[in-house]
Design a protein with these regions (language model features):
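Divalent metal-dependent hydrolysis catalytic cores, especially in the metallo-beta-lactamase
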Residues: 72-80, 90-113, 140-146, 168-172
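Catalytic pocket-lining loop regions of alpha/beta-barrel enzymes
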Residues: 121, 134-142, 147, 152-321, ...
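Active-site-proximal gating segment of KS-fold condensing enzymes and close homologs
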Residues: 117-133
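Active-site metal-binding loops of divalent metal-dependent hydrolases
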Residues: 10-11, 325-326
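Short acidic, glycine/proline-rich loop/turn micro-motifs
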Residues: 111-114, 216-218
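Mid-to-C-terminal alpha-helical segments outside catalytic/metal-binding sites
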Residues: 2-4, 15-64, 69-71, 75-79, ...
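Short, solvent-exposed turn/loop segments enriched in Gly/Ser/Thr/Pro and often Arg
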Residues: 8, 38-40, 103-107, 145-150, ...
Length: 370
């Protein structure tokens, strides 16, 4: 029997009034908004994005593969649980899920905006709304905040504001908004320490690094999907190889929706490259092997990665977390129980507990009765 199941990665569908009602008045005329495109249906228009975001795939959970389309959806026909708290709890019940860690949807694309001041205004508005969304059921809706990282001092202040809103963690953009530096720079160490002191796990979600922009792919467009995971792998290896975890051993990073079955080979490759090539490639001298930092400091989420279910013993089972990704097109909702019975029920009880409940509860300090 499973403990109360916690999805480590679920999403909202930002409602049309979210940004219009909450954004800094300076940006009101340019606030992200829902408009109807005659060919594509309802889409989110955001200043600075060349293409509007179609809402159909944002809320396509439960649709059969042959019905999935980026066109034609109307907001009023989407899963109401994407923005309505009461409806969301019913959606959880339908999938046999007790609680969810909540990420944005439109907010993922906002991470990729070039106008960092506008990005900051959008993220501030989202933080206010997601706190309101989660407030009626804080034990079942685990909200995370956002910040663009325009400066270290501002980001630390944002961390404190996010904590004060009752949110449990922070989703960072794949690239910081500070010019000419990346997260491996030592200037970020005070920010990592602030996250540790505030007990805020930091997440990197796929599609927040601009990895799909300006890229060409061999073969058909289906090949583009694999770059999504590689972008997150690059972030994780950067944290490991640059010594971020060595300098900040209590830092907790979550690699979100990039699957996990690749981890055993990836950590082998980290160690191989470190042993054989670190002098030539100017890698940092680490106190432990790269694999040890990866397996201790990085948490990973996945939905239906069958390899991950079968390779728990080859990873750190205390860092692997299942998710249903509701209401996105990759979601296992409303069939999650069928999936879990097939792949999780055969696992040892301890691994079942860690995968579906314990790891998420420990990471976010959740007090959920078993």
């Amino acid at each position: 029997m499973f403990k109360p199941i916690i999805s480590s990665d679920s999403h909202v569908c930002e409602p049309p009034d979210l940004f219009i009602d909450r954004i800094d008045k300076k940006y009101l005329d340019d606030a992200p908004r829902v408009v109807n495109d005659p060919k594509r249906g309802d889409v989110y228009e955001i200043k600075g994005l060349k293409k509007a975001i179609p809402l159909s795939l944002v809320s396509a959970a439960g649709q059969p593969p042959e019905k999935l389309s980026a066109k034609g959806a109307r907001f009023e026909n989407l899963h109401k649980g994407g923005w309505d708290t009461a409806a969301r709890l019913l959606d959880q019940d339908k999938d046999g899920i007790y609680a969810e860690v909540i990420y944005p949807s439109v907010g993922m694309e906002i991470c990729n905006l070039a106008d960092h001041d506008y990005k900051k205004a959008c993220m501030d508005a989202y933080n206010l709304w997601i706190a309101e969304f989660c407030d009626p059921a804080p034990d079942r809706l685990i909200g995370l905040g956002q910040t663009p990282i325009r400066s270290i001092d501002e980001a630390i202040d944002d961390f404190r504001k996010i904590k004060d809103l009752g949110l449990k963690g922070v989703m960072l953009p794949g690239m910081p908004a500070i010019p000419n530096v990346d997260y491996d720079h030592v200037m970020f160490d005070p920010l990592w320490q602030a996250a540790i002191d505030l007990d805020l796990p930091l997440s990197f979600h796929i599609l927040t690094s601009g990895e799909m922009k300006g890229m060409s792919f061999r073969g058909s467009s289906i090949n583009s999907g694999y770059a999504i995971i590689r972008a997150n792998q690059d972030i994780m290896s950067m944290f490991v190889n640059s010594g971020v975890f060595m300098r900040n051993p209590d830092l907790k990073i979550v690699c979100v929706e990039a699957d996990a079955g690749w981890v055993p080979h990836f950590v082998y490759r980290l160690d191989h490259t470190y042993n054989r090539h670190r002098f030539r490639l100017r890698g940092a001298e680490l106190d432990k092997m790269p694999s040890e930092y990866f397996l201790e400091n990085i948490y990973l989420t996945f939905q239906d990665d069958i390899v991950a279910f079968t390779m728990m013993d080859k990873m750190n089972p205390a860092r692997i977390m299942w998710a249903n990704d509701f209401p996105h097109s990759d979601s296992t909702w409303p069939w999650s129980q069928d999936l879990l019975q097939k792949y999780v029920a055969p696992l040892p009880q301890k691994q079942q507990d860690m995968l579906l409940h314990d790891n998420v509860a420990e990471l976010y300090k959740l007090d959920i009765a078993s």
